[in-house]
Every structure is written in C-alpha cells, then in structure tokens.
Amino acid sequence: GLSDYWLPMAGAASSVKFATSSDADSFYYNTDTMSAIYPSRTSPGLSYTETGVIPRTPTDKEIAKANASSISQPKAEDVPDCVDKLATAIAGGQSKGGEAAQALADKLRESGWFSHGLNGDYPSRAGHGNYRIDQLLAGSAMVGDSEQYASAMALMARSLGLPSRVALGFLPKNDEGEISDSRTEKHGKTTTTKFTGNDVTAWVEIKLDGY
C-alpha cells in the first residue's frame, strides 16, 4: 500500500471527508498549491472522499502566449553546469515563458530515450541528484524515466527564470505502460478511475500567468 505524508488529490478540492473523524484531525490542505499533507502517513484502510474541480487545461497556443509568473523560490544548489548551458541553447531566445517551457519539453521528448532500468530494460540508473542529472543531459546517451526527466526539466526551467516544481502523482496506464482511460468508468455525471502503484509517475509544473 501507499505510505506517504502526501495525500493523493485531484484538482482543486472544495471538501475532503474521511471515513473516520480521527483521520480528519491529521489533514492539512494548501489551496494555492492544491496539495494535501497527512502527517500520520497514509496506510491500508485509509478512506476519504474528495469533492472538487479539475482546472481547465490550457491549449498549446494559450501556453505559448503566456508569460512566466513571478514567484519567489529557493535557489537550487549544486546544479550541474550542463543544465543552464542546454536550457539556454534550447530556449534562451524565447520571449514568452510558455514558449520556453514548450521548447524544453519538446527537446527532451525528441532527444531522450525512456527506460526504468528494470530487468530487460536499457540500463538506466535511478535517482535525480547532481551526478544523475549530469549523466542524463551531458552523457553519451540521454536515457531515464519520469524521475530524471522531470527533475532535469524543472532545473532547466528554473535556470531560465521559470518558476517550476516536480509533482508526484498518478497517471492511469494500460498493460503496455501507455497513458490510457481504459480503467475510467462513467456513472451519470461522475467519473471513477482506478489507480495502482504502477501508475505513480513524476512530471513538471511551471507557473504561468493566468494558469
């Protein structure tokens, strides 16, 4: 089972109801980041119902026209030199923050290879520290999974002045590991999606004006 201090949420929550009142006493929600923390740690048997709204996803054109928001973030430490060098080469000439973010994502998607490094996979080390990110961006082959690519892109975005963070969550996948809605069921106006541990993944979130 999932054991973590962060409670899985979807969209902007308007209410969260726990099956037992004692669980509700250990719950905190940040409306700005739309994230929830559960200091008692999640464990088997924990049950809760979230009611909320999924924000509208902006179109590619809307993203491209958006400027980067002005948000104060802690300075990233021990960042490999290749991060700023590659980010500048890819998107340093973009006038809009949204365009720069898209350029980074497109380049990593086009140039990189995906591998978890499991048995039968192409060799790929776990982790997202200084050495691993340098290996990903400046090594002989760009190979990694969502952990490495999300960390690398977040650092590259920061180097260009784009406020960014790495989010950990769930994306429903089919048996081939591709994003799919095969486990999504509609019941009238409600939609239910079942997730498993294999659906855990990481992605980058960049704050743009208006989104």
Where are these regions (language model features)?
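Residues at beta-strand starts and edge strands
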Residues: G1, P44-Y48, V200-A202
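Soluble extracytoplasmic regions of secretory-pathway and membrane proteins
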Residues: L2-M9, A36-I37, R41, Y149
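Hydrophobic/aromatic-rich core segments of domains that either
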Residues: E147-Y211
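Beta-strand-rich, non-transmembrane domain signature
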Residues: G1-A24
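Short, contiguous acidic/charged loop-to-helix segments that flank catalytic cores in large enzymes
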Residues: Q135-G144, T191-F195
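Short intrinsically disordered, low-complexity coil segments enriched in acidic
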Residues: G1-L7, V53-R56, Y211
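Acidic low-complexity segments
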Residues: K17-A141
